[in-house]
C-alpha cells in the first residue's frame, strides 16, 4: 500500500503494526526525484515489536514523496503464531481489532517541515 505526502514534512517516529499472521514488514519513502529512503525493515516479524521507533535525526520528506509499505503474511500451520488450527480466513471486519484479527498499518508521527529542522538530533 502507499500514500502521497502532500507537503514537506519531517518525520519524528514510525510505528509498524501487524498482528499474529504477519511475517515480514518493510516501509520506505520514494522522493519525487526517485531516491528511495528506507524507513524500517523487519524480516522476521514479532507481534511484540509494535513500538514507536524514533529516528536519530529528523527525516525530511519533500512534498510529493510516496510512503510505501510491503508486508508478507503466513496463514498456515507453519506459522507458530497462527492462533487458528486449522487456519481460518482472517479479517478485521466491522472495525474489530482483536489480536486474532489481522491488519497492516504504519503510523507516522510528523510535523510540517521548516528549513534547518534536518540539523536537529532527537537522541
Task: Show the residue positions of the predicted features.
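His-enriched metal-coordination microenvironments in redox/metal-binding proteins
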Residues: 1-119, 123
